[in-house]
A protein has these predicted regions:
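Helix-start (N-cap) detector for alpha-helical repeat units in TPR-like alpha-solenoids
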Residues: 505, 540-541, 590-591, 629-630, ...
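Hydrophobic alpha-helical transmembrane segments in integral membrane proteins
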Residues: 302-317, 480-520, 541-545
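Register position in tetratricopeptide repeats
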Residues: 552, 602, 641-642, 676-677, ...
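Flexible juxtamembrane loops connecting transmembrane helices in multi-pass membrane enzymes
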Residues: 186, 262-266, 272, 285, ...
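Alpha-helical transmembrane segments of multi-pass inner-membrane proteins
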Residues: 2-23, 39-49, 69-81, 101-126, ...
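Interfacial juxtamembrane loops and adjacent helix segments
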Residues: 161-187, 311-324, 330-339, 347-384, ...
Length: 791
């Protein structure tokens, strides 16, 4: 029973990890894969331990040269969590991304020991062991998983899921497929087409090497029975179809790192094969790897398919990830090491580093407002978030694995079944390492890394030792192991309960996003978002969203004709409490400080001391993100408000412009301050400089026109307002201001036309109606009595 559970958990993990997703949570892929990984690994570990303690009555543990390196790596990841800038993120993963996390990495460590102690490598002629899981079971599960990934992706690319969903809806609306599946770029690996390309390139390398070596071994084994030959022929046909299906997807995705990974890995495979003369008796087994190598080289340097497909085709409309460049990612990583050399910013905390150290050049890009939570490649994240200890432990782990594997495949029995299997695993592992230099890692890629690592270690038969402690010889060990088993069991049960609450909370949060409802002040009437916050009190993100939702309710209440003061006070208290809770949980996350700062900004007239608290909080936010002109400008506005320190405000607005010279809000606000102080020339200069840098900004054009209007330079004001209207034809402020200019110039007809247009956009506006009445009276003179012509 225990052995069957272990085998099921291992095979289910290998098969399901690339495929598993659920639409019930906010993020369908990484979040659910993490739960699957933790649950199946924990069940497998319990079954393995239970089999030793309660059935075999002995502890059997395989010792390998890599075990200490794995434990050292897990230890450094734990240290990186303990000393993290944001421990919640390090433990559970950055919300929305979820990988890496300490729980996920420890689960992968458990998976490694589960594989190395319960899987054995067997040739086709060897009998299956009753005690261990055969490697063929896991390889078959992995190949079938790849097959379903490929099939699912083709269905998505060519709209089959949409057609299936529409057909099901025609039968019953409740049968509709989840929204995530009808998205054209859907694939079960993740929401990223690029990650899919990386995964497929690694899968292709493994399959090409594995099938070549499998064919070589079959040839050596000689004649087979008729049934076995037919079975092998069917498998060969299936594998060829799968490999060329993968190639088709790679051609559609056409992601250059995927081609590079395949190119370098297959090149290493061919060089080693020729050097060792592995295929000297039948070089035809190398035909397919050579073909794929040539294709990868061609598509790495050229794009032969470019222009062959229409602009609206699937090939030309695949979604792509927006990520920091290689240069930016490496720069931020080294800045993180400088700040915290040993353990970095903490596991999963790349967002902290990016916010704090993003370069000035990034602010000139079109995506300058994005706070990236991951770099473009995994090694930069490892360097910045886990420091020297993390990188060193990881490199030693990889180095030791490569060293022992190379020793085995270079040994005297390099052409044996065991060595050939090791070589196919080694090539896939090398492909994974190459991938980590060029793209970031998700849960699936991390799992595949540890899967090949564990299988490679299992193939080191000669250097793997077994240690056995029989309970008959050591009764004390039996008692200790029994206690350990129950302690681990209850520990896992506690984690199941805790993580179950977190999962239900996320389901509530997704329900709120799909159907937003009013925030309730009484806990017994809590909506979905409030229930999420109550269930997952340790999740910072829910408190941030709750604070913003309460703030929205507060603004809505203040806009009521007769606001309820008691209700206002209650909402203010709840808003501040949620903002403070978020800061308490993650004081080094800029979004928590920013949210609380904006709360204090919006309640200045409702709560005593809000200005002082707002200044303090935003100053802390700016420490965490010094190159954010928005935060600096919002801090400046606190000084424009109650404190009235105009010089400080001007200093901060200028600082915001130093950070980003074309930031509209700072330039406009500074221009208004200069205008109010009578420095009209400086105000005009600021606006001229702004519109030259951001000519398409409606706000800049409107404010420039307003400035000219106040100076009675009506022609220049008209020019700016008209440009603003060209950019945004329904911009009410520009249309209204243009009407005022025409009214000042005495052109009441045009003025009336502008005001009526504003009324169409803002029906029922009393001020506009009064303005129209005023202009109408002036433009319609009283009728004079007729006079008879003189004779």
């Amino acid at each position: 029973m225990f052995k069957k559970i272990v085998k099921f958990c291992l095979c289910a993990l290998v098969f399901l990890m690339p495929l598993f997703f659920l639409p019930s949570s906010v993020e369908a892929f990484e979040f659910n894969k993490g739960y699957l990984l933790f649950f199946l690994v924990s069940v497998g570990l319990l079954a393995w331990l239970g089999n030793m303690v309660f059935k075999n009555k002995k502890v059997v543990f395989r010792r390998t040269p890599l075990d200490l390196f794995v434990l050292a790596y897990l230890g450094t990841m734990t240290l990186a969590t303990v000393f993290s800038q944001d421990k919640i993120t390090s433990l559970f993963g950055y919300y929305g991304r979820f990988w890496p996390s300490l729980i996920g990495i420890l689960s992968l460590g458990g998976f490694y020991f589960l594989v190395t102690n319960n899987v054995e490598i067997k040739s086709e002629t060897e009998e299956k062991s009753d005690n261990k899981v055969g490697q063929s079971s896991l390889i078959k599960a992995f190949i079938w998983s790849i097959s379903f990934v490929v099939l699912t992706t083709y269905f998505s690319l060519f709209g089959f899921w949409t057609k299936i969903s529409n057909y099901l809806v025609s039968i019953n609306e409740s049968l509709a497929l989840p929204d995530v599946m009808v998205y054209q770029g859907f694939n079960p690996i993740s929401g990223s087409t690029e990650i899919l390309g990386i995964f497929l390139s690694i899968a292709a390398v493994f399959l090409l090497a594995y099938l070549a070596f499998k064919g070589l071994v079959s040839m050596r084994n000689g004649a087979q029975g008729v049934v076995e030959k037919k079975k092998q022929k069917r498998q060969t046909i299936f594998n060829y179809i799968l490999i060329f299906s993968i190639l088709g997807l790679l051609l559609i995705i056409n992601f250059w790192p995927a081609w590079l990974i395949m190119c370098l890995s297959l090149l290493a495979f061919l060089i080693f094969s020729f050097r060792k003369r592995l295929f000297k008796k039948d070089v035809n087994y190398l035909s397919l790897p050579i073909l794929f190598l040539l294709i990868s080289i061609i598509f790495l340097f050229f794009s032969p398919l470019q222009g062959l497909f229409p602009a609206n085709s699937v090939v030309n409309n695949l979604p792509s990830e927006i990520l920091p460049s290689q240069k930016v990612s490496w720069n931020i990583a080294f800045q993180g090491v400088k700040e915290s050399p040993l353990v970095g910013s903490g596991l999963g905390n790349f967002s902290y580093l990016f916010n704090k150290f993003k370069p000035e050049s990034f602010l000139n890009s079109t995506v300058w407002q994005i706070r990236f939570d991951k770099p473009i490649n995994y090694f930069t994240e490892l360097i910045g978030t886990t420091g020297i200890l993390g990188v060193l432990s990881y490199l030693l782990l990889i180095g030791m694995f490569l060293l022992v594997s190379f020793m085995i495949v270079n040994g005297k029995d390099a052409s044996s079944h065991n060595s050939l299997f090791t070589l196919s695993i080694l090539l896939a592992f090398i492909a994974l390492i190459i991938a980590q230099f060029f793209y970031h890692q998700d849960t699936t890629l991390a799992f595949v890394f540890w899967f090949f690592l564990a299988l490679g270690v299992v193939s080191w038969k000669k250097v793997v030792k077994e240690t056995t402690f029989s309970f008959k010889d050591f009764p004390e060990i039996g008692l200790i192991c029994t206690v350990i088993f129950w302690a681990i069991l209850f520990g896992f049960l506690f984690f199941y309960f805790t993580m179950g609450k977190l999962y239900i909370a996320d389901v509530y949060y997704r329900d709120y996003l799909a159907n937003p409802t009013e925030m309730k002040l009484a806990s017994e009437q809590a909506n979905s978002l409030q229930k999420a916050g109550q269930l997952a009190n340790s999740r910072t993100v829910y408190h941030i969203i709750l604070a913003r939702a309460y703030l929205g309710e507060l603004i809505k209440e203040t806009q009521q004709p007769g606001p309820d003061n008691q209700r206002l006070a209650n909402i203010v208290a709840l808003t501040v409490a949620e903002g403070k809770k978020a800061v308490e949980l993650s004081p080094n996350r800029v979004t928590t400080q920013e949210t609380l700062g904006f709360i204090y900004r919006d309640i200045q007239g409702l709560a005593e001391g809000a200005t002082e608290w707002g200044i303090t909080v935003l100053e802390r936010a700016i420490e965490l993100e010094p190159r954010n002109p928005i935060l600096i400008s919002e801090l400046a506005k606190f000084y424009v408000g109650d404190s009235g320190d105009m010089e400080k405000a001007k200093e901060l607005f200028k600082r915001a412009l130093e950070v980003k010279s074309d930031y509209v809000d700072a330039a406009v606000s500074l221009s208004i301050l200069e205008e109010n102080e009578g420095n009209t020339e400086e105000a005009v200069r600021l606006m001229e400089d702004l519109v030259s840098k951001v000519p398409s900004s409606v706000d800049a054009r409107f404010q420039f026109g307003r400035l000219y209007y106040n100076q009675e330079q009506y022609e220049k004001a008209i020019e700016q307002f008209e440009i603003a209207m060209q950019l945004f034809p329904n911009h009410s402020n520009s249309i209204y201001s243009l009407g005022l200019v025409y009214q000042k110039k005495g052109d009441n007809t045009k003025a009336l036309e502008m005001f009526k247009k504003v009324l169409e956009l803002n029906p029922g506006n009393i001020e506009i109606k009064n303005r129209i009445d005023e202009v109408s009276r002036v433009s319609t003179p009283e009728t004079e009595p007729e006079t008879e012509p003189e004779e």
